């Protein structure tokens, strides 16, 4: 588990993607994966400090959790990179989820006031 965001971590992702791929092949079902990278994240860290960056990461993780289904598998892969495995999801539906994620993150107002801003 990623200590900062509460999402699965990279190691768990690597285990789960193997499991989900095997299950998808075995059951002949769709499996999609979304890779999400936060634009300009380095600028946030450089301008406001790492505590503010942590607030952004937690905020994005919360948006991901609220946007995807309960059985989808959200992971913080490292830094500002996230992966979401979407079992039993075709490409069109995965695209719709990715667009909802992008829109929800783009429209979010993530509060960094709890961080001691530089």
Q: Residue locations for each model-derived region?
A:
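Regular, well-ordered alpha-helical segments
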Residues: 15, 22, 43-46, 66, ...
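Residue-level recognition of strand-loop junctions within catalytic nucleotide-signaling folds
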Residues: 46, 86-89, 106
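Catalytic strand-loop-helix junctions within cyclic-nucleotide turnover domains
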Residues: 85-94, 113-117
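Active-site-proximal alpha-helical element of nucleotidyl cyclase-like catalytic domains
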Residues: 52-73, 81, 100, 105
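A short pre-motif secondary-structure segment
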Residues: 73-76, 117
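Conserved nucleotide-binding and Mg2+-coordinating catalytic segments in signaling enzymes
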Residues: 1-15, 36-49, 58
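Short regulatory alpha-helical coupling segments
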Residues: 10-30, 61-69, 87
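Active-site-flanking beta-strand signature of metal-NTP-handling nucleotidyl enzymes
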Residues: 32-37, 74
């Amino acid at each position: 588990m990623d200590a900062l965001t509460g999402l699965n971590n990279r190691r768990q992702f690597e285990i789960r993607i193997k499991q989900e791929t095997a299950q998808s092949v075995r059951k002949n079902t769709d499996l999609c994966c979304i890779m999400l990278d936060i634009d300009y994240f380095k600028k946030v860290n450089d301008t406001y400090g790492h505590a503010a960056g942590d607030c952004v990461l937690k905020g994005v993780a919360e948006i991901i959790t609220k946007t995807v289904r309960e059985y989808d598998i959200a992971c913080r892969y490292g830094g500002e990179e996230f992966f979401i495995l979407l079992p039993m999801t075709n490409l069109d539906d995965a695209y719709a989820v990715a667009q909802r994620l992008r829109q929800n993150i783009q429209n979010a107002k993530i509060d960094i006031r709890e961080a001691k801003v530089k």
